[in-house]
Amino acid sequence: MWVFGYGSLIWKVDFPYQDKLVGYISGYSRRFWQGSTDHRGVPGKGSVWGVAYKLPVGKEEEVKAYLDFREKGGYRTTTVIFYPKDSTTEPFSVLLYIGTRDNPNYLGPAPLEDIAEQIFNAAGPSGKNTEYLFELANSMRSLVPEDADEHLFSLEKLVKERLEGKQNFNCIKRPN
């Protein structure tokens, strides 16, 4: 069994796997439309780059149960075709965790500035949403430097601007 990661499963791999491949799935777009600290893709045009992990033989159900718990909060699974970056490897089926529009955490489309503000202010048991965004952006630059994920990198820029603005605000002193 192979599982496709396109958010924290790329940079926070806390489960056993036998093999991994960089590649993409088609017909989806990466968006920050989930009202939790998680980042999930939504069906649509385009493609989403990420990493497919082959779960260890004999441990598939155990690892899947862990991932089901980790990816809770309005997600369902579906099977999609994965296209490895290495074109000598044939495409194959992977399991995809995806946020659904009918879950209570789904926020839907919003202006990038609003999403950036949400990310800037959001924190939960798994940490700050800014960490999630920056780890994902750095991972994508490293894994697939040729992919210009406009949504992801625009959000990263807007959130960094907010952080810089906060630091500058904290450095302002009153004149004596």
From Swiss-Prot:
Belongs to the gamma-glutamylcyclotransferase family. ChaC subfamily. This is Putative glutathione-specific gamma-glutamylcyclotransferase 2. Substrate binds at V3, F4, G5, Y6, G7, S8. The active site is at E71 (proton acceptor). It is found in: Cytoplasm, Cytosol. One of its GO terms (biological process) is glutathione catabolic process. Coiled coil: none annotated. Catalyzes the cleavage of glutathione into 5-oxo-L-proline and a Cys-Gly dipeptide. Acts specifically on glutathione, but not on other gamma-glutamyl peptides. InterPro entries: ChaC, GGCT-like, GGCT-like_sf. It catalyses: glutathione = L-cysteinylglycine + 5-oxo-L-proline.
